[in-house]
Amino acid sequence: MKKNKRLMVMAGGTGGHVFPGLAVAKKLQQQGWEIRWLGTADRMEAELVPKHGIDIDFIKVKGLRGQGIKRLVLAPFQILNAIFQAKAHIKRWQPDAVLGMGGYVSGPGGIAAWLSGIPVVLHEQNAVAGLTNHWLAKIAKKVFQAFPGAFKDAPVVGNPVREDVVALPDPMQRMQDREGAVRILVMGGSQGARILNQTMPQVMAQLGSGFEIRHQAGKGSADEVRLAYQQVGVEHVEVSEFIDDVAAQYAWADLLVCRSGALTVSEVSAAGVGAIFIPFMHKDRQQALNADHLVACGAALMIEQPQLTVDKLAGEIQKLGRDTLLSMALHARAAAQNNADQVVADAIVALTEQK
């Protein structure tokens, strides 16, 4: 009896790494592949991945950026230990390929796979390559990038996006007959965004009536944000810590106000919704660069955090009538690259057939 092929996905830390990995995993599961995950026990993958019916192994590893002298001295030993842990998991399960989607776990996992003779496939979600993927690209059999600029010669394929987001009706079908309050969805990503939690209640108080708000505040912040809206007299607002059915929220919204993490940018485009991006302030402007192409094509506006004020954001929202919002949504949908999960899955299949 022919044995099913096996893929080990290495991804963790944030939804921006984990959800694209799940999208590729689902494509291969549909072709009969067995999937196993490599992650860390204290990050979101530990809880999220098993909910999708995928077994997960853990290694102990942490990032190096911004750490003190003691951590830097110990780092080589900790990395070696993580590589040995990953190698043990790989030896026990014997995957045919590994897929690195970023996060601290991908580094030791990718090196362990390479040392074990297992082909490594990488996908970089951001417009600026993370430190882990920058080094792993040198040993990977295949490298993909979501946006131009992360790597010089890697194919640009977009980000793997959940099928329920891709399957949403066209913006024209959703939005052309809408009337009444403009629907604003505020999203801070899987961790929430303090700047949005602090700013949006004041923005909506300044704008007054005519808007309906749904605000994803992040873990532990919902009560505080709900109170902030109440204190400035804003009604018609729903506040939650996390969004389970993100596709339904995109379908509901006329406008997003959000960070521009890689997955958010790709989902905004796939869904076809206009956005005002407030990029997180990386020193390499990673999130700003992620969103540049949607701003350039008229699908989005961007206010970088140093320039963000209540007056500025309120003014930008006030300018956006329904015709403009529909136009932005259509431009967003037109810019979407929605087959990244299939492209990456096909590359993994092709690599294993060469073995």
Swiss-Prot record:
Taxonomic superkingdom: Bacteria
Cross-referenced InterPro entries: GlcNAc_MurG (IPR006009), Glyco_trans_28_C (IPR007235), GlycoTrans_28_N (IPR004276)
Major location (coarse): membrane
Pathway assignment: Cell wall biogenesis; peptidoglycan biosynthesis
Reactions catalysed according to its record: di-trans,octa-cis-undecaprenyl diphospho-N-acetyl-alpha-D-muramoyl-L-alanyl-D-glutamyl-meso-2,6-diaminopimeloyl-D-alanyl-D-alanine + UDP-N-acetyl-alpha-D-glucosamine = di-trans,octa-cis-undecaprenyl diphospho-[N-acetyl-alpha-D-glucosaminyl-(1->4)]-N-acetyl-alpha-D-muramoyl-L-alanyl-D-glutamyl-meso-2,6-diaminopimeloyl-D-alanyl-D-alanine + UDP + H(+)
Keyword Phosphoprotein: no
CDD domains: GT28_MurG (cd03785)
Protein topology in the membrane: Peripheral membrane protein
Binding site for UDP-N-acetyl-alpha-D-glucosamine: 14-16, 126, 162, 190, 243, 262-267, 287
Pfam family, one: Glyco_transf_28
UniProtKB keywords: Cell cycle, Cell division, Cell inner membrane, Cell membrane, Cell shape, Cell wall biogenesis/degradation, Glycosyltransferase, Membrane, Peptidoglycan synthesis, Transferase
Gene3D superfamilies in the cross-refs: Glycogen Phosphorylase B (3.40.50.2000)
Compartments reported by the entry: Cell inner membrane
GO MF, any single term: UDP-N-acetyl-D-glucosamine:N-acetylmuramoyl-L-alanyl-D-glutamyl-meso-2,6-diaminopimelyl-D-alanyl-D-alanine-diphosphoundecaprenol 4-beta-N-acetylglucosaminlytransferase activity
EC number per UniProt: 2.4.1.227
GO biological processes: carbohydrate metabolic process; cell division; cell wall organization; lipid glycosylation; peptidoglycan biosynthetic process; regulation of cell shape
Gene Ontology annotations for the cellular component aspect, listed alphabetically: plasma membrane
Family to which this protein belongs: Belongs to the glycosyltransferase 28 family. MurG subfamily.
Function summary: Cell wall formation. Catalyzes the transfer of a GlcNAc subunit on undecaprenyl-pyrophosphoryl-MurNAc-pentapeptide (lipid intermediate I) to form undecaprenyl-pyrophosphoryl-MurNAc-(pentapeptide)GlcNAc (lipid intermediate II).
HAMAP family, per database record: MurG
The protein's name: UDP-N-acetylglucosamine--N-acetylmuramyl-(pentapeptide) pyrophosphoryl-undecaprenol N-acetylglucosamine transferase
